[in-house]
C-alpha cells in the first residue's frame, strides 16, 4: 500500500471527497511517518515472526507515492484509522477518539505478541 492509498482510505473513513481533502494532504506525509515511528514495536514483532532481523528505526516514506515499508496486511487494516485520527486530532475530538481506539484495537488484534527471554534474578 502506498502512502497515497492509505491517505485516500483515511479520507473515506472521514467522509471526505478527494477534491476536498487537499487541506489534509498537506499533513499526511508527516502523519504517516509518525505512524511508522509509533508502530516500530509492532513492525518488529511481525518481522521477528517472519524470521527477519529487527529494525532499529522505522522505515520512513519519502513521499506519499512511496510504498509503506511494513507488513502489508497491518498497513491496510490499521494505518488508515491511525492516519485519519492524526489528521483530525485538533478539530474533531469525538472522531479522533473513535478512530484512535479503532486503530489501537486493530493493531492489537493483528500483531503477534513479542517474545523475549525472561532473565532469572534469583
Residue ranges and their predicted role:
Residues 24-25, 68-78:
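Structural motif
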Residues 92-100:
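Short conserved catalytic/interaction loops centered on acidic-Pro-aromatic/His motifs
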Residues 62-66, 81-82:
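Active-site-adjacent structural patch at catalytic or cofactor/ligand-binding sites
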Residues 77-90:
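Short, hydrophobic/amphipathic alpha-helical patches that form generic packing surfaces
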Residues 1-64, 98, 106-122:
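Conserved short "hinge" loops at termini or chain/domain junctions
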Residues 85, 100-103:
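Small-residue hotspots
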Residues 19, 90-91:
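Residues in soluble alpha-helical coiled-coils and helical-bundle/repeat scaffolds
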